[in-house]
């Protein structure tokens, strides 16, 4: 008669691959037959087989037995009883959670390929491959053998003619440009016509220098002035001076005498110490695949242009370290801040797959570029863009923006030695309106001071700048600055739909003062016979909690509100979001914050006014159902987020979203809200676990890395996962614990992850087997279940799969299935889904 060991499974994740291997290893040290019996399921399995153990569907809390019979049953009984009591409960540690505080590492599917990497700082994301092509930086001092002077009169005449030609050439290029290109050419036109530059050039030739010598001397003079500035913005303008001066050399002496460096004839990743905007514009964009710069910041005109053309760009690059790979194929990875040199075939295939996925995503999103945002039940909610400069407007509207919900004008005041004048601001707003083509732009007046210091205003540093002297609170002291901005906005309003929005309003006194100044600015323009929109709308940021309690009074004086969710969160919850010690308290899913939002939206709508939201919260897809439930009139977000937001909104029913919001406001903790949202995502679409679009047949993937990357990419394209690399990392974490190869050329990679939107069983049938741990696999069934899924669904499905795969008939049916639909149907039937 068999000896019996009775025990309860205390493993939090049940018996999966790792603990099963421990049981299997220990049981195989005995000759006796040992059977595992799960009393809950009444399933039995050979304890010397990990696959059979998994098939018993043993979960946490299950009552189980080991039945032992054979020559050494006494010894086995004693040893296994002790092990099950003392060691078994501790043989499966939970997987460590990945923290996102630090820079995320490279994807595991890439690092496993052992690529040779050089890191740099990303200023424009994306990835591409091409020939590493050096571009000579524009060093006027290295030109050498400058032409000699032919007399003062001749040089002055040549200089005057050259300056005229430069201006005409820039104006000609402006006729065929728009967006960022237009704005930067305008900056160059301003430089070429600059009085100080002209005077310095003329002084040089009057002193006997040739035009070339005077141009180089003038460039050095102004570049030295800029380089002494503590402002990175001004330092980067030195490149524009050299650019315009080189254009002047070319106009006077010809391009043969001073040829522009860099002509592209093949797909290229260009590298340079620095690149002028004109050099960038001259590069053939059909061949330019990436840009590597030794110097250049986020405000560099070249970097701004690269962004507008969606060229992956890295700065801070060690150019000398790249010299050995000139004229060789490399890859730029702007998503990871990496340059990959000497790529082997596997690395090349990795980036080819990246390119295919990005092309597919762009094709998916194309339909949303021109469609208005609506919920599934037809409720209209405008999706607008946040921008900080007119150069961003064209790309935003091209990405599907229905308006600009936030034009942050403070960026126009920062990193310079003096405030922009009325004409400069007017031109910037007009450029943005040109791209808008009749669509609305909400201009937020300068939110400077406090945490956004401007040197020339001499606002002293503060202990708590978020609560200090900033935004509307500085306007009275700097009234002329505020009036200048109001005048520029009003003048531009004659050319399109502009609205004015005031930041940091906390009282009626501030609103009334602003309206007084706005009325004065309007009267000035009337007296000067300058046209503007007499009915221009005035709104305020709803970011200081006190405003929520005077909404009725505010509505008597203003036209609209826009919720600044970032600041409102920190003010309402008393959290400095830049203080790492209290960051965990900064959570816009706090039920108190959600209640505050709902109160504000309903109060505004009762007064018949418009209210939008322009904080970071608007771009979070997971929170979108709550924002729809609030009944907001508009959501404003970063431009790249717009197509996906429209697509997600089209799947939401506003009535269901309202019910969800009510449930969220009834929660007691942020964690409960997160769990509620996760459950809503899983049930909203009622998406089946198995679907043909997540099944690929005869895949050409040649390694485990390609399989996991490809299958998670498919989940992204199917709309079931927004962060495929994070989901992939969770799968690799499981693989690091124990390989999920099951034998029979089958593997079942699996994970419970917060990065899967809809729990999914994916399938890949490969053309040829790939190495999977110590075995090979050709048929992959990937199980990805949402971390917040209720119950033990993950282990139940895994257990059923393991049991079925032990049967040859089931394996053959999967391997020989004629279509993805046939595989989906078979899995649904066999797994009782």
From Swiss-Prot:
Its cofactor is Mg(2+). Phosphoenolpyruvate binds at residues 408, 444, 566-567, 577. The modification Phosphohistidine is found at residues 16, 301, 750. Residues 688-830 form the PTS EIIA type-2 domain. Keywords: Cytoplasm, Kinase, Magnesium, Metal-binding, Phosphoprotein, Phosphotransferase system, Sugar transport, Transferase, Transport. One of its GO terms (biological process) is N-acetylglucosamine transport. Pfam families: PEP-utilisers_N (PF05524), PEP-utilizers (PF00391), PEP-utilizers_C (PF02896), PTS-HPr (PF00381), PTS_EIIA_2 (PF00359). GO terms for cellular component: cytoplasm; transmembrane transporter complex. Mg(2+) binds at residues 543, 567. The keyword Nuclease does not apply. The PTS EIIA type-2 domain is phosphorylated by phospho-HPr on a histidyl residue. Then, it transfers the phosphoryl group to the PTS EIIB type-2 domain. Belongs to the PEP-utilizing enzyme family. This is Multiphosphoryl transfer protein 2.
């Amino acid at each position: 008669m068999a000896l019996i060991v009775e025990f309860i499974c205390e493993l939090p994740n049940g018996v999966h691959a790792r603990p099963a291997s421990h049981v299997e290893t220990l049981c195989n040290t005995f000759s006796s037959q040992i059977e595992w019996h799960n009393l809950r399921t009444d399933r039995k399995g050979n304890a010397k087989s990990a696959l059979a153990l998994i098939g018993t569907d043993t979960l946490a809390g299950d009552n189980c037995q080991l039945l032992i019979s054979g020559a050494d049953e006494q010894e086995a009984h004693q040893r296994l009883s002790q092990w099950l009591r003392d060691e078994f409960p501790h043989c499966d540690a939970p997987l460590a959670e990945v923290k996102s505080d630090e820079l995320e590492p490279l994807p595991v599917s890439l690092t496993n390929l052992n690529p040779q990497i050089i890191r740099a700082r990303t200023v424009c994301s994306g990835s591409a491959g091409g020939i590493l092509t050096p571009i000579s930086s524009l060093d006027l001092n290295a030109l050498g053998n400058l032409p000699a002077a032919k007399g003062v009169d001749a040089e002055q005449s040549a200089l005057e003619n050259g300056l005229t030609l430069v201006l005409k050439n820039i104006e000609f290029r402006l006729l065929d440009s728009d967006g960022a290109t237009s704005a930067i050419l305008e900056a160059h036109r301003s430089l070429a016509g600059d009085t100080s530059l002209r005077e310095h050039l003329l002084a040089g030739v009057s002193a006997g220098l040739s035009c070339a010598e005077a141009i180089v001397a003038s460039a050095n003079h102004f570049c030295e002035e800029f380089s002494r500035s503590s402002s990175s913005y001004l330092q980067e303008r030195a490149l524009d001076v050299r650019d315009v001066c080189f254009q002047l050399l070319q106009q006077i002496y010809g391009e043969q005498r001073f040829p522009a460096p860099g002509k592209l004839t093949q797909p290229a990743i260009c590298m340079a110490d620095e690149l002028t905007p004109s050099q960038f514009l001259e590069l053939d964009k059909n061949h330019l695949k990436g840009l590597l710069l030794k110097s250049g910041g986020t405000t560099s005109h070249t970097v701004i242009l690269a962004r507008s053309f969606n060229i992956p760009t890295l700065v801070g690059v060690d150019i000398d370290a790249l010299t050995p790979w000139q004229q060789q194929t490399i890859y730029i990875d702007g998503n990871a801040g990496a340059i990959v040199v000497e790529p082997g075939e596997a690395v090349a295939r990795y980036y080819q797959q990246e390119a295919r996925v990005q092309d597919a995503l762009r094709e998916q999103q194309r339909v949303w570029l021109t469609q208005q945002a609506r919920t599934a039940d037809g409720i209209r909610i405008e999706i607008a863009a946040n921008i900080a400069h007119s150069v961003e407007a064209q790309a935003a509207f091209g990405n599907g923006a229905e308006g600009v919900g936030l034009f942050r004008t403070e960026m126009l005041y920062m990193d310079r030695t003096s405030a922009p004048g009325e004409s400069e601001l007017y031109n910037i707003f007009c450029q943005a309106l040109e791209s808008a083509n009749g669509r609305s732009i909400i201009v937020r007046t300068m939110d400077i001071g406090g945490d956004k210091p401007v040197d020339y205003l001499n606002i002293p540093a503060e202990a708590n700048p978020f609560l200090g002297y900033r935004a509307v609170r500085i306007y009275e002291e700097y009234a002329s600055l505020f009036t200048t901005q109001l005048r520029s906005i009003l003048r531009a309003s004659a050319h399109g739909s502009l609205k004015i929005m005031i930041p940091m309003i906390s009282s009626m006194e501030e609103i009334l003062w602003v309206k007084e100044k706005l009325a004065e600015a309007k009267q000035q323009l009337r007296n000067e016979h300058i046209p503007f929109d007499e009915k221009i709308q005035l709104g305020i940021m709803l970011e200081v909690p006190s405003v929520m309690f005077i909404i009725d009074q505010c509505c008597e004086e203003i036209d609209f509100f826009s919720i600044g969710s970032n600041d409102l969160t920190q003010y309402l919850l008393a959290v400095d979001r830049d203080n790492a010690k209290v960051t965990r308290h900064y959570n816009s899913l706090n039920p108190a914050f959600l209640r505050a939002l709902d109160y504000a939206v309903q109060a505004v709508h009762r007064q018949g006014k418009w209210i939008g939201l322009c904080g970071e919260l608007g771009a979070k897809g997971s929170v979108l159902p709550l924002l729809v439930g609030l009944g907001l009139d508009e959501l404003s977000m970063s431009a790249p987020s717009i197509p996906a937001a429209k697509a997600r909104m089209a799947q939401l029913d506003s009535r269901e979203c309202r019910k969800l919001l009510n449930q969220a406001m009834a929660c007691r903790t942020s964690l409960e809200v997160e769990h509620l949202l996760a459950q809503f995502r899983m049930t909203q679409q009622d998406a089946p676990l198995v679907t043909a679009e997540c099944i690929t047949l005869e895949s050409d993937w040649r390694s485990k890395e390609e399989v996991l990357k490809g299958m998670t990419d498919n989940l992204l394209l199917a709309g079931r996962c927004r962060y495929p690399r994070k989901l992939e990392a969770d799968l690799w974490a499981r693989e690091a614990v124990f390989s999920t190869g099951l034998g029979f050329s089958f593997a079942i990679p699996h994970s419970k992850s917060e990065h899967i939107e809809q729990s999914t069983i994916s399938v890949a049938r490969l053309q040829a087997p790939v190495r999977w741990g110590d075995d090979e696999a050709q048929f992959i069934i990937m199980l990805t279940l949402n971390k917040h899924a209720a119950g033990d669904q993950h282990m139940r499905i895994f257990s059923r799969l393991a049991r079925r795969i032990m049967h040859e008939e089931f394996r053959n049916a999967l391997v020989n299935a004629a279509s993805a639909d046939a595989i989906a149907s078979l899995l649904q039937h066999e797994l009782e889904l």
